[in-house]
Amino acid sequence: MGGPSKERVWGATIRAADERARETRHVADNAACEAWNMRMQHYGGPAQPSPPIGDAINAGFRYLEVKCAGCNTHSAVDLTTLRRPRETPIWQLEQRMRCRPCSEMRGYPYKRGHLVRLRRTNITTRQADAWYPGDQRDRN
C-alpha cells in the first residue's frame, strides 16, 4: 500500500496548529498576569482570582515581589524554584511568606509578607550607573 504517510500529509498542518496554540496560550497567560498586577496595584490587596504559577512562568513573569509590613523590605521570590504544583494560584503563596529579618529578630518564623506584583526581572536587576570622568569608584 504505497503512498505518502499521514505524517508527510498532515505533519506541517499539525505543527502549525500546535505553534498557534502555544502562542495563544502565551498571549492569554500574559494578559492574565498583567490584569492581576493591575488589580494588585489599584485594589492594594490580595486580588483573586490570580493566575497559577505555571501561567506566570509561561508569560515570562518569573519573580513575585513581596513586601514585609513590619520592616518595609521588598523581596523577589523566584517562582521557578518553588516546590509547589504549577497549578497553585499565586495568592495562596502569601500564607507561606516569612520575612527573614523580622524572623531573625524575633527568633521564630514570623509572617508579615504581602504580595505586591509579578515581575519579569529580579528586584536587584538594574541598569548600570552612568560613568563620569573622575569617578573614583572601582570599575571592573
Identify the role of each PLM range.
Residues 1-140:
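Basic nucleic-acid-binding interfaces
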